[in-house]
Regions:
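Domain-core detector
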Residues: 1-101, 109-166
Length: 166
């Protein structure tokens, strides 16, 4: 129900404050922090999906490189991904296209082929696992749901998202 409130009459994404006011009319007790994280995730996923469509149009003309916000708020596991460079058709992009967590500010950019050395394939697998693993007290991986690519999968919320369990 709340997802229908994300866009205004012109189809533009509403600022969080406006979105939150409207959600509160439907669900007065909804947690603002959770809703803000979900709103940001939906916006980032939609932007990543649109970006992926552009990447697909360009084909393998460019390599892709993972970049963080490069500040003190970047998670250590995401910081390890900084500069990861692989071809556009590398399977890693099906699992590591941002957003890779709640309030993730990372991004993937196209870079000129040959400008950067490729990150070793075996190292990439390990880095992807580390960036998307966060075990809870029962040993379940809470971050597994972030192993997706919104553009490839054509979804805003990944298949393991709790929304699908309602």
């Amino acid at each position: 129900e709340a997802s229908q409130l994300l866009r205004d009459d012109r189809g533009r994404i509403k600022p969080f404050g406006k979105f939150f006011e409207e959600v509160r009319q439907i669900h007065p007790e909804y947690n603002e922090r959770y809703l803000e994280a979900e709103h940001q995730f939906a916006v980032h996923s939609a932007q990543a999906a649109a970006q992926w469509a552009e990447i697909e149009r360009d084909g393998n003309d460019y390599d892709l490189q993972y970049r963080t916000a490069n500040d003190g708020k970047v998670r250590p596991a995401h910081a390890k991904l900084e500069g990861l460079t692989r071809p556009q058709d590398d399977p890693c992009w099906s699992e590591i296209m941002p957003p890779n967590g709640w309030k993730c500010r990372c991004r993937v950019v196209q870079v000129r082929k040959g400008k950067y050395d490729y990150t070793d394939r075996n190292e990439v697998s390990q880095l992807v696992r580390e960036a998307t693993t966060d075990l809870d007290s029962q040993g379940r991986n809470r971050a597994e749901m972030f192993r997706f690519n919104p553009g490839m999968d054509r979804v805003i919320f990944p298949k393991h998202h709790p929304y699908y369990n309602l």
